[in-house]
């Protein structure tokens, strides 16, 4: 078994009703899942994948592989009634805000992670516990494994839910994202794709370049980006907004340039996107 170091940042709780891996199907959460499958750490009771409906096809293909008997525990899918992109373009302003790059500078507010990731996962947890949406669950009943790695330790924060205790296996294992890649390569596992919505403004040029290699997905994102600056949307968003950090239309953005800006996924502190 791998030697884990519980401390003030992350710790194991004794005898929870449910141990669940928050599975983003990216490199970090995949590494945790496969470490459990190989017996290097204890196995969770299950994993939950929150499906926004807008992940890259490569993520869904990787998820299907994980579901093919690779893991000794089930993967449950938590999915809202409609995809995030559908809600966004339908004008669901309260439920579907993503962090656009604002033409005048800065980024807009967002609630996409909470409404398309956090809430569906919590609803699924309640379902697995046999508790309704308003039923009581004792504090500390659930140990939720989050795929934040050592190099992203600033993303850590409490669950914000009394009955869910966030645990960070990779922090306890002292593993960075690069350590995860090395662990996977040493055991001849495929390199997982980056988990995120295809139109996520947090991604840098590497993400956009990877997306452009999938023509259908690239065309979909180009159309969403252009739609953002149609007159009705300019009025809705009180100005021009963009998906690319350069604040120009994505079709014109220099995605060949090196990524030298901040890692915007560091703004996503729940640990359910990009992992």
Model features per residue range: what roles?
Residues 1-275:
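Nucleotide-activated chemistry modules centered on ATP-dependent adenylation/adenylyltransferase
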């Amino acid at each position: 078994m791998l030697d884990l170091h519980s401390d003030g940042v992350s710790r194991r709780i004794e005898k929870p009703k449910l141990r669940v891996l928050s599975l983003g199907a990216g490199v970090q959460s995949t590494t945790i899942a496969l470490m459990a499958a190989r017996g290097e750490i204890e196995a969770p009771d299950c994993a939950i994948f929150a499906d926004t409906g807008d992940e890259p096809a490569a993520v869904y293909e990787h998820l299907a592989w994980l579901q093919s008997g690779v893991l000794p525990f089930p993967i449950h899918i938590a999915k809202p009634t409609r995809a995030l992109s559908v809600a966004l373009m339908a004008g669901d302003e309260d439920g579907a805000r993503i962090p656009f790059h604002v033409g005048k500078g800065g980024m807009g507010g967002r609630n996409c992670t909470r409404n398309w990731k956090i809430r569906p996962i919590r609803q699924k947890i309640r379902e697995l516990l046999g508790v309704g949406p308003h039923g009581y669950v004792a504090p500390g009943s659930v140990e939720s494994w989050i795929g934040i790695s050592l190099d992203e330790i600033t993303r850590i924060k409490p669950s914000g839910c009394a009955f869910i205790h966030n645990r960070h296996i990779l922090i306890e294992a002292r593993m960075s994202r690069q350590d995860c890649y090395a662990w996977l390569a040493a055991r001849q596992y495929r390199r997982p794709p980056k988990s995120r919505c295809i139109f996520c403004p947090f991604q840098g040029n590497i993400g956009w370049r990877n997306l452009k290699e999938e023509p259908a997905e690239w065309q979909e994102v180009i159309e969403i980006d252009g739609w953002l600056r149609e007159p009705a949307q300019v009025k809705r968003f009180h100005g021009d907004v963009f998906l690319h950090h350069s604040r120009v239309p994505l079709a014109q953005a220099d995605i060949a340039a090196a990524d030298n800006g901040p890692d915007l996924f560091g703004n996503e502190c729940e640990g359910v996107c990009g992992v």
